[in-house]
A protein has these predicted regions:
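Short aromatic-glycine-(Arg/Gly/Cys) micro-motifs in beta-strand/loop hairpins
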Residues: 1-22
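Domain-level signal for compact, non-enzymatic binding modules
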Residues: 8-10, 33-35, 66
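A structural feature that tracks compact, well-ordered secondary-structure segments
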Residues: 11, 25, 41-43
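Generic structural motif
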Residues: 14-16, 33, 61
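A short, exposed loop/beta-hairpin motif centered on an aromatic-Gly-Thr core
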Residues: 21-31
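A short, charged, amphipathic alpha-helix used as a generic interaction element across diverse proteins
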Residues: 32-48
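Short, mixed-charge low-complexity intrinsically disordered segments
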Residues: 44-67
Length: 67
């Protein structure tokens, strides 16, 4: 059984009324990035579900602390 992991995800979207792509960082806990899709969509409602993942990584350490 896979344990849930902490993901740091860079989201991109071009919300209505914007001329250039915007970005935001999303943190979520799940078994995969795909599992976090509903939370990512809810996190950025102005994008109306039209978001994409530019980058992500699993957070395993913060400072001297293991995650």
């Amino acid at each position: 059984m896979q344990l849930p992991q902490l993901y740091m995800i860079l989201l991109g979207a071009t919300p209505k009324g914007r001329n250039i792509e915007q970005h935001d960082i999303f943190f979520g806990i799940g078994n995969s990035v795909k599992d976090l899709l509903p939370e990512m969509i809810a996190f950025w409602p102005e994008a109306k579900g039209k978001i994409h993942v530019d980058a992500y990584r699993i957070v395993k350490k913060v400072g001297n602390y293991k995650v």
